[in-house]
């Protein structure tokens, strides 16, 4: 170890006891002379040069935080051995906080802190120091870096990241079960003293919970804590620094602990016996009532399953578990009958669906109760002995024959008499009827299987004492067949025979049908009504027969048509038969037997249109003619609707003003000057569209200028109409251009007038009322005038 290193260790050891003293001055130790080969090199003048190596022996200062003194806090002192004390050197400080937070005395090198420092904001500051010549401003020492470390004091209390914690733990947990861990932080320096050493303790929540001092883990402290007794707990935890010693700072937090539910409670019925009532008329599936077992647990731990385990009504009732309400709904399983049984007893069991094996020791998680269901009597409708009836009857029975009987009874204990009726909507033809007292069904009209083989009837049974109580039943009547119809030709046969036919030639194969339906099937026999020399019938014994010729050759000019009666009979009892006539035409044929032409009568219809087609064509023509005539008549009767139906019907209607045509023939152009006539505007005209009710003095309107426009003219007339006291109290058409009826005069000249003033009739003035009598006398004249 060199002497230089030894001196550095010595200075460090000497300063250790004084680290906490802020007034301690750190001075630069005298330079240590280390001679090297270069430093001992001789000068040119023969003298040996000695270079002195200088170094700062300090590299850090220590400063306590949160200084509360009134003066600047002393940090330390910088000093160079070049400083002679004459003020020739100047100390300069730079780096973190230099000049603001830390200042240096330029002459003495003393460093001070200008304000209080918080270590939690910044733990150390790095600065640089340099000594320069005040006159030359040249450094006498190289710039050196040092650190000011801030010593921590216990000025921060522990804090929790959350003011309130929320935690949960299952109820009935064992002692020591971990609930939650809370952790507090301290901003003080954990490496210096006990300022940041936190100890946890519980202030509130004992004796239910405890906390580990070092870790902050909260654990249960009591066994078998029951949620049903108390569900919420509030625990206050304290975190204290300085290892929990007196004088340490502390912080608290609140932990809300909830006991979560476990299935530790069995379901319980609140009553040992439950009474329910149900009407006997309730259909299957009707809810009778509900039972519910209470469970102190919650959620799935309280889910209950209900079932009927015993009783005399297990076949009549069922129970369904309602998941939403946790109720057992008892429903009707089979139809009930008050007269048969009036009381049922059920034993219902409720059991938890989720059982925790840890709590088997608490007992069975099930409970039972007795449910008694009383059946209430209602006035029931009659009950038929069958759900439906089927009667079979032959179609040839006489009217009034009983075909069957329906039976019904009143299920009530009163046994009210029953009245039977037939729903006529199911028997519109009134073929059947029923005896109202005993339900005997009989015919009222003859039956015909060929018209209807089945009849679907509805019989109504009603109580006589209470006709509203009715029941319906279906009665199916099947009509059995009787051989009452003779067989007939299946189709109409158009048969012909060739003139060159030979004996035994087949000309037609015939068949028959019968409306009857015998049990053994149809069997027909064919024969001729009488022996025929021209044709014969050969029965094929398969319900068909062949028509054969018996002679050689036919002549259509002699006989054009033959009528062959054929007898068709069946084999049922009684035997029915009919005679069908087969029309055979004689036609000319080729060598192959193909028909070429027949008689004139036979060829008439095929050559032209049929009678039905001709009738249809004539009807179409007649219908078209009728349509044309009706259309023409409607066109003649159509009239043009008038613009205004009457003078009274002019309110709120559109009025056309251009219905005077195009003017007189001698008019060359429209002259707006006629509307600019001041005299016409100023003239106060009487309205003649209505009868005046009062006389009033005409008012003279101000003289309008000559340049009056059409708009001003219309506005003046509108104002005049609004101020007219004789105007009706509704909007009406005011006709100012009224010129009266057509004049009887042939000319405007008085010389050419065909009438005199005396011929004018002013009698209408008398119809205006007494107020216009004077005017009527002036113009109408009196009786004396007439006599004169």
UniProtKB/Swiss-Prot annotation:
Its membrane topology: Single-pass type I membrane protein
Pfam family, one: Cadherin
Endpoints of the signal sequence: 1-22
Cytoplasmic side: 635-788
Modified residues (Phosphoserine): 784
Record's function text: Cadherins are calcium-dependent cell adhesion proteins. They preferentially interact with themselves in a homophilic manner in connecting cells; cadherins may thus contribute to the sorting of heterogeneous cell types.
Name of the protein in question: Cadherin-10
């Amino acid at each position: 170890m060199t002497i230089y290193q030894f001196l550095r260790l010595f200075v460090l050891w000497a300063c250790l006891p004084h680290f906490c003293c802020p007034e301690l001055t750190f001075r630069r130790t005298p330079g240590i002379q280390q001679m090297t080969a270069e430093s001992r090199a001789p000068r040119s003048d023969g003298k040996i040069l000695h270079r002195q190596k200088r170094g700062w022996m300090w590299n850090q200062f220590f400063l306590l935080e949160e200084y509360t003194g009134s003066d600047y806090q002393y940090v330390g002192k910088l000093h160079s051995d070049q400083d002679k004390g004459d003020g020739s050197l100047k100390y300069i400080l730079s780096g973190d906080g230099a000049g603001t937070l830390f200042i240096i005395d330029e002459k003495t090198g003393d460093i001070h802190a200008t304000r209080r420092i918080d270590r939690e904001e910044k733990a150390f500051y790095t600065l640089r120091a340099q000594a320069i010549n005040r006159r030359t401003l040249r450094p006498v020492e190289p710039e050196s870096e040092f650190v000011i470390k801030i010593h921590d004091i216990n000025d921060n209390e522990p804090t929790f990241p959350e003011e309130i914690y929320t935690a949960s733990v299952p109820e009935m947990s064992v002692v020591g079960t971990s609930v939650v861990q809370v952790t507090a932080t301290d901003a003080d320096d954990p490496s210096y003293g006990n300022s940041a050493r936190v100890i946890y303790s519980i202030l509130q929540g004992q004796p239910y919970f405890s906390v580990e001092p070092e870790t902050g883990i909260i654990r249960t402290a009591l066994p078998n804590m029951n949620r049903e007794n108390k569900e919420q707990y509030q625990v206050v935890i304290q975190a204290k620094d300085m290892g929990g010693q007196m004088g340490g700072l502390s912080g608290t937090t609140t932990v809300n602990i909830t006991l979560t539910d476990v299935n530790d409670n069995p379901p319980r019925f609140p009553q040992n016996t439950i009474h329910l009532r149900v009407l006997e008329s309730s259909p299957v599936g009707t809810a009778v009532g509900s039972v519910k077992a209470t469970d102190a647990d919650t959620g799935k731990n309280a889910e209950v399953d209900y079932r009927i385990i015993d009783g005399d009504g297990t076949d009549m009732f069922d129970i369904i578990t309602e998941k939403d309400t946790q109720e057992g709904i008892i429903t009707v399983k089979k139809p009930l009958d008050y007269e048969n049984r009036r009381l049922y007893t059920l034993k219902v069991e409720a059991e938890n669906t989720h059982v925790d094996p840890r709590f088997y020791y608490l007992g069975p998680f099930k409970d039972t109760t007795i449910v008694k269901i009383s059946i209430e009597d209602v006035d029931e409708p009659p009950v038929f002995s069958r759900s439906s009836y089927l009667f079979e009857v032959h179609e040839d029975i006489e009217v009034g024959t009983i075909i069957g009987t329906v039976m019904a009874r009143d299920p009530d204990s009163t046994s009210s008499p029953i009245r039977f009726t037939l729903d006529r909507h199911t028997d519109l033809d009134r073929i059947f009827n029923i005896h109202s007292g005993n339900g005997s069904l009989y015919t009222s009209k003859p039956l015909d299987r060929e018209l209807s083989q089945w009849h679907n009837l509805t019989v109504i049974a009603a109580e006589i004492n209470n006709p509203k109580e009715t029941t319906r039943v279906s009665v199916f009547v099947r009509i059995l067949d009787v051989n009452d119809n003779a067989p007939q030709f299946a189709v109409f046969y158009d048969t012909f025979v060739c003139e060159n036919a030979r004996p035994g030639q087949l000309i037609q194969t015939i068949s028959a049908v019968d409306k009857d339906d015998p049990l053994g099937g149809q069997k027909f026999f064919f024969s001729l009504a009488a022996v025929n020399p021209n044709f014969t019938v050969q029965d094929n014994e398969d319900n068909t027969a062949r028509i054969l010729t018996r002679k050689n050759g036919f002549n259509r000019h002699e006989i054009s048509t033959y009528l062959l009666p054929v007898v068709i009979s069946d084999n049922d009892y009684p035997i029915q038969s009919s005679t069908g006539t087969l029309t055979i035409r004689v036609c000319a044929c080729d060598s192959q037997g193909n028909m070429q032409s027949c008689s004139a009568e036979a060829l008439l219809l095929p050559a032209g249109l049929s009678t039905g087609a001709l009738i249809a064509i004539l009807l179409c023509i007649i219908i078209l003619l009728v349509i044309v005539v009706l259309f023409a008549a409607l066109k003649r009767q159509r009239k043009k609707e008038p613009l205004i139906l009457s003078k009274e019907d002019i309110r709120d209607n559109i009025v056309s003003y251009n219905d005077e045509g195009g003017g007189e023939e001698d008019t060359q152009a429209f002259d707006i000057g006629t509307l600019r006539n001041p005299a016409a505007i100023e003239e106060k005209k009487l309205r003649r569209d209505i009868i005046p009710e009062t006389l009033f003095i005409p008012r003279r309107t101000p003289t309008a200028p000559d340049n009056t426009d059409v708009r001003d003219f219309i506005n003046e007339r509108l104002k005049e109409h609004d101020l007219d006291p004789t105007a009706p109290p509704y909007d009406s058409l005011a006709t100012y251009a009224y010129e009266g009826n057509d004049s009887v005069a042939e000319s405007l000249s008085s010389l050419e007038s065909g009438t005199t003033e005396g011929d004018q009739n002013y009698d209408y003035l008398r119809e205006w009322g007494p107020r216009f009598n004077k005017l009527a006398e002036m113009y109408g004249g009196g009786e004396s005038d007439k006599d004169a």
